[in-house]
Every structure is written in C-alpha cells, then in structure tokens.
Amino acid sequence: MPKQNNETDLEYKRRVIDIKSASFCGAKWYNATIWLGSGQTTSCHHPLPHAIDLHEISQNPAALHNTTQKKKEREQMQRGERPAGCDYCWKIEDMSKDAISDRVYKTVIHSEEDLNVAFARPSYTDFNLRTLEIAFDRTCQFACSYCNPAFSSTWVNDIRKNGPYINLVSDGRGHFTHAHDRSQLYKFGETNPYVEAFFKWWETDLHRTLTELRITGGEPLMSAHTWQLIDWFKANQGRSSTRLAINTNLGREVDVDRLLASTQGIELDIYTSNETITGQAEYIRDGLDWSAWVDNMEKIAKSGIRGLHVMCTINALCLPGLPAFITTMMMFKRSYNRNFPSMSFNILRFPSFQSPYVLPLALRQTYADAIEQVLVQYQDDSLMHEHEVNQLTRLVAYLREPVVGPDLPRMQNDFKQFYTQYDQRRGKNFVETFPELKEFYEQIH
C-alpha cells in the first residue's frame, strides 16, 4: 500500500512527495482525462484542457497523454516550480503550511516505485498511464447549471434553440455563448482519429498498465463506445487487471439494470454526482429526478460492485442543502458500508459567478457553521474516510475566507443575469427553490 503504518495524509506527503520537490504531483505522469470528441487532455480535473497533436497520435498513440505541454510541466515539477494550470492546489496549500491539496490524493494512489521513476526520468520521456478518465463524446440528457455545451448535448440544444446567454461580463471563456462545436469535431458515424488512437493504445499497452479506466461523458452510458469497451472486458476476462469505473448521472433514462447485468464478473466502480437534495438538486442538475437518483443509488449499493462514489461540485447554490445531503449519504453508508458511497467535495471555480465566493461573507459563514456542525457530528465515525473529513475541513476554511476585489460585483451581477435567463429557458424559479438566498438574490441590480 502507498501509505505505511497508518500514516496520515500529511505524514505521507512529507515522506514521499516533499523529498522530491515542493510541487511534485504523480498525476502529471500517471493520470489523465482525455476528451476524444474534442481531442483535448489534462492531467486531472483542475487544470484547463489543452489540445492533443493529431499528427503525433498518428505516429504514437501514447501522445494522447504525453503532450508537449505536460512534458514542460513535468520538468517544472522536477525543479520544484509551480505550473500555472495547477493553481487550484496551490491556493489550497497557501491557506496554511499543512493544508492537504488534491495533489496528495492524486499521488498516493501510485506506487512509490512508479513515483521515483517519474521523478528521476528525463521530462521528455513517454509514460504509460496508471489511471485514465476518458470521454468519447458529449451526449448527455442533463444540462446542469455549472456545465456547458462543451460537455452536454442538451446544453447544445438550449443554446441552438434559445441563443446565447447575454450580459455575462465575467464569463471570459464564453461558456454559455455558443454551441462549442469544437468539442465534437466529428459527427456521429464519422471516423474519429482520437478514438482510433485510444483503442490502438488500449490494445498495445493500456490494458496492461492501467489500474483504473474511468469512462465519463456526457453521459457515457449513452455512448456506443462505452458498451464496446464493456464488451471487450466481458470477452477478455483475465487478460486485463484494469478496474473499470463509469461516471453516470443516474438519471431516469440510464439503464442501470443493463449496466449491472453486463458487468457481472468485472471489477466495477460507479461514480455519480450530486451535492444537495430534492428540488434544489433538480434545479442545479437540470434533468435530474431526485427520487430516481436515490432509487438507482439503492440498486447499485445492493448489487455487489466494488464501490460507489458521489462527487460533490461545491457551488453557491448547493450550500443551503449540503449538510442534509451529507446526512443522507451517511445513512447510505450505515445501511451498506463506508464505500457505498464514498464522497468527494470539489470546490467549483468556473464559471466563477457560480462559485461559493459569489455569496456575501455573512452567508458563507452561516453555511460554514452548518457544514462544520455536520463535520463535528461525523468526523470520528468509522464510516467517514480521512479524505472526506479533510475535504470538508478545507471547505469550511475556504468559506470563511474574506473576499474583496473589483470582480465581486461583476460576479454577482452575472449570477443574477444567468439564473434569470436559466429560469426562463428551463421553466424554473430561483426564489421559490432557494428561499435561503432570496434576500441576496433580489438585492442584486
């Protein structure tokens, strides 16, 4: 195991990571997210994606991951410098000298031998992945408020039907202004060279070197390529020790029964997303049916798969209901075990006007207090993982940070502009759904 003698995350960091450099992260070598629809990659979900060179992958499928940009960032980490794209972790670490950022969690999953090899090899060396998250396309029946057309075909339909969201001055990336056609470079039925390169690399190396292959989307269970991979695992049992993981929104339309039946005998983890309960969850994650989601969670928890994981994207709207959501998930744990589900709490940064920092400090402190009460209630419970306690602890500290600067009024204006248009397009009502935020919302002009 990567950790020794029940050491804490901080003890592990000091023993394994800090002796290499002040910025080393195993994810830069051994982990990747790759969007095959757009031909982009990143080392984890925090840095922005960048383009994969089409010529390079025609000669070397491993260039899907081993891009020029990643090799430059590896060299920076070997020298103890901080790559700019990894600022999510640097901000967490700068909050206190012993703060644990995600680079610890992205590193601890790899063997010390692999980590030593990564640090010692020249930065231009190609590495085979150990963990990979892959998206074949953006087909999805949800259009979550913090998502955008680059990752959801339902979001594309909104923009094409209703036009761009307007008057969003802080959205410099234009998340909600166009259909992001570059996110789906090839039409359905056309040959996609990025998909071809992936399956080549899978056959030559990845099925041997990957410890986990995680399929995301869009909604991956709506992609034929996902079922193609599941069929490969069924037909080649014993040939690969790779664990299969699938991100799914567990919507009404998702055929959970087919998934569980098709993966019998395959080591499977299921990841899903949510961060609050009932109508507030349905507002944020447009397309969600809360009752259907809970029913699917129950079905999976009873199925005997390896693990069930819930990813919480911490945004401004989820904070009122987050304590109740955590309590609901603890009830699941008590009924099944601590891994059904495990939880992660990732603070949303983009779009910035949906981040928790858009709220006034007094509101954020109120929600920090409520989350802290839940944390105190459960932190010594054997059902809680150390990473869950640590991530909630850092969330409480984050919410209590004062925020000043010229961008805050613009972010708050965009918050009101966006949700006003979101309500009109989606048939929703912000004030009725979030009475806790009514006063704040209505005073924005």
What label would you give each PLM region?
Residues 46-93:
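Membrane-interface junctions of multi-pass transporters
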Residues 1-58, 62-65, 100-108, 156, ...:
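Radical SAM enzyme [4Fe-4S]-AdoMet core and its adjacent flexible, acidic
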Residues 90-94, 147-153:
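Detector for the c-type heme attachment site
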